[in-house]
């Protein structure tokens, strides 16, 4: 006959982080980001379809705005648990470079390819955000400052919001309520203003 399990025991099992054999800071959240990445990719695809074919239907764009913070969260988790940040940055940087011409062709006026070459796609923003957070984690302040200055000064998608969100996710990794409050205070007002 099965034994009765108390609610507090079930809650404890569900909310206690699994033991991870790696050293470094621990997150009190689910580290399997594969499902989150799929959700972010689907949201991004819906956003791009809406932007290209149904620009007057705002719901496509709103759904798409879920993608960026999810990608920032996944990059923060990756930063904390990757074995080689340089390889991680290299892969992201290569993907940013390869996708740049397609980004310009898809989202900027035809015939102005060269004029829009410095409208950097979202992967450059994510690359610089990851680079900045790596600088913060390793106490290389100049690297953090350089990344923050670069995304804030030049024409990057989401500008400094990438570093801002990754900073919130990194610093509040074991304080989810504080992280959620800071996220709402920092990211959602930008969305309400039509970002």
Question: Where do the language-model regions lie?
Answer:
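Alpha-helical transmembrane segments and their immediate juxtamembrane cytosolic regions
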Residues: 4-195
């Amino acid at each position: 006959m099965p034994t009765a399990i108390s609610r507090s025991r079930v809650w404890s099992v569900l909310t206690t982080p699994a033991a991870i054999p790696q050293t470094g800071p621990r997150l009190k959240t689910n580290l399997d980001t594969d499902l989150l990445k799929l959700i972010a990719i689907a949201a991004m695809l819906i956003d791009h379809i809406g932007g290209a074919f149904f620009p007057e239907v705002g719901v496509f764009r709103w759904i798409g705005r879920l993608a960026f913070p999810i990608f920032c969260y996944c990059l923060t988790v990756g930063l904390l648990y990757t074995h080689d940040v340089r390889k991680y940055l290299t892969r992201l940087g290569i993907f940013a470079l390869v996708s740049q011409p397609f980004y310009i062709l898809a989202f900027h006026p035809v015939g102005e390819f060269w004029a829009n070459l410095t409208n950097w796609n979202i992967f450059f923003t994510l690359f610089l955000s990851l680079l900045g957070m790596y600088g913060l984690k390793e106490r290389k302040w100049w690297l953090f400052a350089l990344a923050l200055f670069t995304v804030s000064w030049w024409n990057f998608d989401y500008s400094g919001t990438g570093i801002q969100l990754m900073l919130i996710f990194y610093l509040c990794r074991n304080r989810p309520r504080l992280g959620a409050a800071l996220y709402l205070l920092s990211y959602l007002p930008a969305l309400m203003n039509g970002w």
